[in-house]
């Protein structure tokens, strides 16, 4: 009954989108619901097939270590791409030709009263949209390759930049803006209001395409965390878009409409995946979903022209990466898996540890470890000679356990997601308040 009601709602939303405005966003909601239903239906039906072909893993944080299907993130990714292809006529509905005399002439078009010339088809927007889909397709393929062949970090770290090439090329051809604004207090010294970064701006965008997927992949290992953080990021991005729809100038609304129509269907398929991946999980998402989801946010930030704001929403992921650097760069021994340790006796998660007795850290880093311990940023274990013999692994997940003590897996995940949401809200407030003070204006308002 619920599915019949949902299908009826989808039909009404899509029909409404053809006859009323704002058509693109209304249709996006309809396709988001459709994506949720399709993903929710497919996941339980394909799980056993994934296990049969060897795509499975053991849940180390459960008694008995049950075997669960892995790489299930490929299902919502495939559904999302399929939905976004079907969505094309709806986002460009107002430009569609309904009468033509041939020879490429547009005689009569569907017209929406929005102050735009509907006879001029926005090929630049279509190329951006298609490049985004092509970029995401390439990312999904790379993610599946990683899940199948278990690529080493040094090999897969830069792969998202290769997948982002279509996106960067279309940005260069259709938009090509590489100027960044200078804070007002620096304008007097530099005698200019902006700086052209040229090629370095493309390096920055490629770096963002590398960072977003990998940052989600690093902050993982707890049931529901990979998908949960992406749902929180999607909600925060939509809140930012809503600010521009309600308060922003007309010039910025198209970019944020583009952002919203990419995010809403993504939110739909992610909610369906989260239903099966949250504690106690029945499926694993795999690296495929982490790459796919991260690239969605990179694409939205780049093509929506608010990449700096998007990076602010990734503050917990940035902190997690910086916090992990001593282990990632081998200053401190780094186990292959740094997941929190599950205690079967009480069912709680404890910080996992790196053994420093067998493989001591670099001598220059020992005082830093003790400083971090004093700041309560890590937990150290000492022997009778006051020598360090182990440290908690340096991830945001383990740090949460160091701060708040052992907790059940679902509570641990919810704590990190609440932290992500609160920091994201503060980041948005800071972006639109402090940014306006530093630069003298913001896209939402101007400071005089």
From Swiss-Prot:
Q: Name one Pfam family in it.
A: Glycos_transf_4
Which residue pairs form cystines in this protein? none
* Top EC group: transferase
Q: How is this protein positioned relative to the membrane?
A: Multi-pass membrane protein
Enzymatic reactions: a di-trans,poly-cis-dolichyl phosphate + UDP-N-acetyl-alpha-D-glucosamine = an N-acetyl-alpha-D-glucosaminyl-diphospho-di-trans,poly-cis-dolichol + UMP
Q: Where does UDP-N-acetyl-alpha-D-glucosamine bind?
A: 58-60, 70, 223, 336-338
Please state the protein's primary subcellular location. Answer: endoplasmic reticulum
InterPro entries assigned:
Glycosyl_transferase_4, GPT
**Which pathway does it serve?**
Protein modification; protein glycosylation
The answer to whether UniProt assigns keyword Cytoplasm to this entry is no
**How is this protein activated or inhibited?**
Inhibited by natural nucleoside antibiotic tunicamycin, which acts as a structural analog and competitor of UDP-GlcNAc.
Q: Keywords in UniProt for this one?
A: Endoplasmic reticulum, Glycosyltransferase, Magnesium, Membrane, Metal-binding, Transferase, Transmembrane, Transmembrane helix
The coenzyme or cofactor needed here is:
Mg(2+)
| Function of the protein | UDP-N-acetylglucosamine--dolichyl-phosphate N-acetylglucosaminephosphotransferase that operates in the biosynthetic pathway of dolichol-linked oligosaccharides, the glycan precursors employed in protein asparagine (N)-glycosylation. The assembly of dolichol-linked oligosaccharides begins on the cytosolic side of the endoplasmic reticulum membrane and finishes in its lumen. The sequential addition of sugars to dolichol pyrophosphate produces dolichol-linked oligosaccharides containing fourteen sugars, including two GlcNAcs, nine mannoses and three glucoses.
Entry's family note:
Belongs to the glycosyltransferase 4 family.
Q: What is this protein called?
A: UDP-N-acetylglucosamine--dolichyl-phosphate N-acetylglucosaminephosphotransferase
Q: Could you tell me the gene encoding this protein?
A: ALG7
């Amino acid at each position: 009954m619920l599915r019949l009601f949902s299908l009826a709602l989808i039909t009404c939303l899509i029909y409404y989108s053809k006859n009323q405005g704002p058509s693109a966003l209304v249709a996006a909601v309809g396709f988001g619901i459709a994506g949720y239903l399709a993903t929710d239906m497919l996941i339980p039906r394909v799980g056993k097939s994934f296990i049969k072909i060897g795509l499975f893993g053991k849940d180390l944080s459960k008694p008995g270590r049950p075997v669960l299907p892995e790489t299930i993130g490929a299902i919502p990714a495939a559904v999302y791409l399929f939905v976004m292809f079907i969505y094309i006529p709806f986002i460009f509905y107002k430009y569609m030709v309904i009468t033509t005399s041939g020879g490429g002439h547009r005689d009569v078009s569907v017209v929406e009263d929005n102050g735009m010339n509907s006879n001029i088809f926005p090929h630049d927007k279509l190329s951006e949209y298609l490049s985004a889909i092509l970029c995401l397709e390439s990312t999904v393929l790379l993610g599946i390759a990683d899940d199948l062949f278990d690529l080493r970090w040094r090999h897969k770290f830069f792969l998202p930049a290769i997948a982002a090439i279509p996106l960067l090329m279309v940005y260069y051809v259709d938009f090509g803006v590489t100027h960044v604004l200078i804070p007002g207090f620096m304008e007097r010294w530099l005698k200019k209001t902006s700086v052209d970064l040229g090629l370095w701006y493309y390096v920055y965008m490629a770096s963002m395409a590398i960072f977003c997927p990998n940052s989600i992949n690093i902050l993982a290992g707890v049931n529901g965390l990979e998908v949960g953080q992406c749902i929180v990021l999607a909600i925060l991005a939509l809140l930012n878009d809503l600010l521009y729809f309600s308060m922003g100038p007309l010039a910025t609304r198209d970019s944020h409409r583009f952002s919203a129509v990419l995010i809403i269907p993504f939110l739909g398929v992610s909610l369906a995946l989260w239903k099966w991946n949250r504690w106690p999980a029945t499926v694993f998402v795999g690296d495929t979903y982490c790459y796919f989801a991260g690239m969605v946010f990179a694409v939205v930030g780049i093509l929506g022209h608010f990449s700096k704001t998007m990076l602010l929403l990734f503050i917990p992921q940035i902190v997690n990466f910086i916090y992990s650097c001593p282990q990632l760069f081998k200053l401190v021994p780094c186990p292959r898996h740094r997941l929190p340790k599950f205690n079967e006796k009480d069912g709680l998660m404890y910080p996992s540890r790196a053994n420093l007795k067998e493989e001591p850290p670099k001598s220059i880093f020992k005082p830093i470890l003790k400083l971090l311990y004093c700041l309560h940023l890590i937990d150290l274990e000492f022997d009778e000679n006051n020598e360090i013999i182990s440290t908690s692994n340096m991830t945001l997940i383990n740090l949460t356990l160091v701060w708040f003590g052992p907790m059940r897996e679902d509570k641990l995940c919810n704590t990190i997601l609440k932290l992500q949401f609160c920091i994201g809200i503060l980041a948005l407030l800071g972006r639109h308040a402090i940014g306006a003070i530093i630069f003298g204006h913001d896209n939402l308002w101007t400071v005089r």
